[in-house]
């Protein structure tokens, strides 16, 4: 270590302590010893730049009262680790309840069918404008690639608000069917739709695993020379399986809502999906793909999303490639908050998503 580097780190450490001391002196918690213990904040830094942080994250006043109430409800301790079967059972139960709520709030027509041999739900608006009947959206649900956390939860509101047909795809899940099985399923559905719709009249979107799969499908289509769709919705996307990002270290996905908890380094959830594929494969990890010529893309995340870093990094990559890419970051909310319809922020986010597809998926 050079003397200059040592001095710089010493100054950084001293500044950190001074800032923390000033904050503690001004914060109401410093008025009592019990509160002071609760609100202690500080940081130290290791030689390699790793930060050891204890911090205060107050309830933000910058979100809606509904969001404040909801965030407060997420403070209970995590449940014990679940088996895959338990996770799927719990996710299915939650999804059924939330899907029923989606259809109550955003009525649509629903037809269960298969497309290109893949199970799909066909959603159509109750009041379907004739001008929109040449457009279609493909929805890819979230759920960590090993369960279904949002097929109707995501597709129903967008169908209702955008007044565009949505095909929700039940792609094969890991670990029984690792990469590229899910990509193959969606590509098959997309190619089937190309028999009826022009590429520019098709949009693809999803949340979390569904957003990642959306990007993977686009990368595979581009690599194979298949015409790309007219628009992509990448809502909390994970485009790089080769390394964890800063926000993944700060926040961990705990159940569906997410909480402020450290990532468990002993649990590599990507392995079951990625299998033996090279983590730098440009389809598995689209951050390494040639993004030139990709369609207009909307990326949505939030400041307590474990995929905040991933989403913003992919947005920058798209911009570098000259893609028309928009990024919207919501304040203080966790991963996939737009699954929770009671939040005003959810209503805004869903409206933005619907408007994006109405604007970008050509008639």
Language-model segments: which ranges?
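Elongated, amphipathic alpha-helical interaction scaffolds
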Residues: 37-49
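Accessory substrate-recognition/RNA-binding modules or partner subunits associated with SAM-dependent
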Residues: 83-87
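Alpha/beta-hydrolase superfamily serine-hydrolase fold, recognizing
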Residues: 28-40, 54-66, 70-81, 105-363
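A domain-start/cap signature at the N-terminus of enzymes
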Residues: 89-113
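C-terminal motif of bacterial Sec signal peptides marking the signal peptidase cleavage site
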Residues: 22-25
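Bacterial N-terminal signal peptides that target proteins for export
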Residues: 2-14
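Positively charged, low-complexity intrinsically disordered regions
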Residues: 9-10, 28, 96
């Amino acid at each position: 270590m050079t003397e200059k580097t040592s001095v710089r780190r010493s100054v950084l450490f001293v500044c950190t302590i001074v800032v923390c001391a000033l904050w503690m002196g001004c914060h109401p918690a410093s008025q009592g010893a019990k509160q002071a213990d609760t609100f202690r904040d500080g940081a130290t830094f290791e030689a390699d730049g790793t930060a050891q942080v204890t911090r205060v994250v107050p309830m933000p006043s910058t979100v809606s009262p509904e969001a404040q109430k909801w965030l407060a409800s997420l403070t209970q301790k995590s449940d014990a680790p679940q088996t895959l079967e338990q996770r799927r059972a719990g996710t299915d139960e939650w999804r059924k309840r939330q899907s029923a709520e989606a259809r109550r709030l955003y009525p649509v027509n629903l037809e269960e069918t298969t497309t290109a041999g893949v199970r799909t739900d066909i959603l159509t608006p109750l009041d379907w404008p004739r001008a929109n009947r040449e457009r279609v959206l493909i929805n890819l649900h979230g759920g960590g690639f090993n369960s279904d956390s949002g097929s109707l939860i995501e597709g129903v509101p967008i169908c209702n608000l955008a007044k565009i047909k949505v095909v929700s795809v039940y792609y094969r899940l890991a670990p029984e069917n690792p990469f590229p099985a899910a990509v193959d399923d969606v590509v098959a559905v997309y190619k089937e739709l190309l028999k009826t719709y022009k590429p520019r009249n098709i949009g693809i979107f999803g949340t979390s695993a569904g957003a990642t799969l959306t990007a993977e499908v686009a990368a595979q289509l581009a690599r194979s020379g298949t015409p790309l769709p007219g628009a992509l919705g990448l809502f909390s996307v994970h485009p790089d399986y080769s390394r964890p990002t800063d926000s993944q270290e700060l926040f961990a996905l705990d159940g569906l809502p997410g909480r402020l908890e450290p990532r468990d380094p002993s649990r590599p959830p990507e392995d079951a999906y990625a299998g033996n594929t090279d983590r730098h494969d440009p389809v598995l990890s689209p951050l390494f793909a040639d993004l030139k010529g990709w369609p207009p893309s909307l990326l949505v995340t939030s400041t307590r999303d474990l995929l905040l870093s991933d989403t913003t990094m992919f947005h920058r990559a798209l911009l570098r490639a000259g893609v028309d890419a928009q990024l919207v970051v919501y304040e203080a909310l966790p991963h996939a908050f737009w699954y929770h319809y009671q939040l005003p922020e959810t209503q805004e986010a869903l409206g933005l998503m619907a408007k994006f597809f109405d604007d970008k998926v050509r008639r």
